């Protein structure tokens, strides 16, 4: 089979764009905690000395936006030593109400307004038009592509050794990148790891940072991979640490951060398609978020059911309409039953109307802050209901297996 290289990247919680995502989702959680029916669309911009929060919110909850912003920044580790102090940074808030034109389509769907439908799950329309994708593959236990899985693990480890004090000279910002060699569609060899680690002054790259990153960040994760018996060759991989030579200036004083600029990191690392809609700061009435979560759930169950080794699904919505306007299933030749049968089974087992997604995945909860770094998919945390494989048996039954 043909051999090829594929690369995915991740970033730490202290990366400027991820700061923006985490602030937006912390605010979403705060509104949902006070009012589970809150409609929230919040964007965050960070730059030197300033945080600007803007968007639309309709909620009965009262939220101290500035306090949430400061707490998020300081919890991540932004203090005076980093040059961007969460306790003193300027916070500007520009939040209005959701447009009534949008609200009327969400509150009373096309099916109810025009067709007179009485099904309670048909009462809520999609919060916008758009296309969403979900993907799963059997190449890792998490049913996520290996490059993004390892990139996330390394980024999370980079933050952990900082928080735990193992590498106290590290600062919050950072990036990881992993290149894997594939033989056909199977990962076989680790080719390259890139780590960019934000650090204090007077840290020598060659004698301190590179050995520490290799021993404290990468080695534990390679050991974890070995324990998962993936058969990945890791000897002789290329390691690049801070290839510019220094990374003392980081966070929002090095680069501005903005909500929604890491959508490929948030999903499948470029291995699967993306509809273009960001997740963070959006309540689940926005199908950009809820339908993407639902399709990850569907794809994961298709693979767990043994109907295909790889599955990618697309769904499309019209604003204000409950029923999707389209569903597409792709299995890349790995299916064990005909693709039309898989598509029929998916439609039979899963209800992809917005209200049904919200009900089935229990999305009206303040759970979103933990999604905003290290990937929305691939982590089997208790609140990540879209990572369950609880409908694999139903899918098998639907195709007669």
Curated annotation (Swiss-Prot):
State the family it belongs to.
Answer: Belongs to the AdoMet synthase family.
Source lineage? Bacteria, Bacillati, Actinomycetota, Actinomycetes, Frankiales
Q: Which UniProt keywords apply?
A: ATP-binding, Cytoplasm, Magnesium, Metal-binding, Nucleotide-binding, One-carbon metabolism, Potassium, Transferase
Q: Which CDD domains match?
A: S-AdoMet_synt
**Pathway terms, separated by semicolons:** Amino-acid biosynthesis; S-adenosyl-L-methionine biosynthesis; S-adenosyl-L-methionine from L-methionine: step 1/1
* Protein name per its UniProtKB record: S-adenosylmethionine synthase 1
- Annotated catalysed reactions: L-methionine + ATP + H2O = S-adenosyl-L-methionine + phosphate + diphosphate
Give me the comment on cofactor binding. Binds 2 divalent ions per subunit. Binds 1 potassium ion per subunit.
Q: Where in the cell is it found?
A: Cytoplasm
Provide the residue positions that the database annotates as binding ATP. Answer: 15, 173-175, 246-247, 255, 261-262, 278, 282
Q: Which organism is it from?
A: Frankia casuarinae (strain DSM 45818 / CECT 9043 / HFP020203 / CcI3)
Q: What is its EC number?
A: 2.5.1.6
**Record-linked InterPro entries:** ADOMET_SYNTHASE_CS, S-AdoMet_synt_C, S-AdoMet_synt_central, S-AdoMet_synt_N, S-AdoMet_synthetase, S-AdoMet_synthetase_sfam
Q: Where does L-methionine bind?
A: 56, 98, 255, 286
């Amino acid at each position: 089979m043909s051999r090829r290289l594929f690369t995915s990247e991740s970033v730490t919680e202290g990366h400027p764009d991820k700061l923006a995502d985490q602030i937006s989702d912390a605010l979403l959680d705060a509104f949902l905690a006070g009012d589970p029916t809150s409609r929230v669309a919040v964007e965050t911009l960070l730059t030197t000395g300033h945080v600007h929060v803007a968007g639309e919110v309709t909620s009965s909850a009262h939220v101290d936006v500035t306090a949430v912003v400061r707490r998020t920044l300081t919890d991540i580790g932004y203090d005076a030593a980093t040059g961007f102090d969460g306790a003193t940074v300027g916070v500007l808030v520009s939040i209005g109400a959701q447009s009534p034109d949008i609200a009327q389509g969400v509150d009373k769907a096309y099916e109810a307004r025009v067709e007179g439908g009485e099904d309670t799950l048909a009462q809520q329309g999609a919060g916008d038009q758009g296309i969403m994708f979900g993907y799963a593959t059997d190449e890792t236990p998490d049913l996520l592509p290996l490059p993004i899985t390892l990139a996330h693990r390394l980024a999370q480890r980079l933050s952990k050794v900082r928080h735990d004090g193992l590498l106290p000279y590290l600062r919050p910002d950072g990036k990881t990148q992993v290149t894997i060699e594939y033989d056909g569609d199977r990962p076989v060899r680790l080719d390259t790891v890139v780590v960019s680690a934000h650090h204090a002054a007077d840290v020598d790259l060659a004698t301190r940072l590179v050995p520490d990153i290799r021993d404290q960040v990468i080695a534990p994760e390679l050991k974890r991979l070995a324990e998962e018996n993936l058969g990945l060759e890791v000897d002789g991989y290329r390691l690049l640490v801070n290839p510019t030579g220094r990374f003392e200036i980081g966070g929002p004083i090095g680069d501005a951060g903005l909500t929604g600029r890491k959508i490929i990191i948030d999903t499948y690392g470029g291995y699967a398609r993306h509809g273009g809609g960001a997740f963070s700061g959006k309540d689940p009435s926005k199908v950009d978020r809820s339908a993407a979560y639902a399709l990850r759930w569907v794809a994961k169950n298709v693979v767990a059911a043994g109907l295909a080794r790889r599955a990618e699904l697309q769904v499309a919505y019209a604003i204000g309409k409950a029923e999707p306007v389209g569903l597409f299933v792709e299995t890349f030749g790995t299916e064990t039953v005909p693709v039309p049968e898989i598509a029929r089974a998916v439609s039979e087992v899963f209800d992809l109307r917005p209200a049904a997604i919200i009900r089935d995945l229990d999305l009206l909860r303040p759970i979103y802050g933990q999604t905003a770094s290290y990937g929305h998919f691939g982590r089997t945390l208790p609140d990540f209901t879209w990572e369950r494989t609880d409908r694999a048996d139903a899918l098998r039954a639907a195709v007669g297996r």
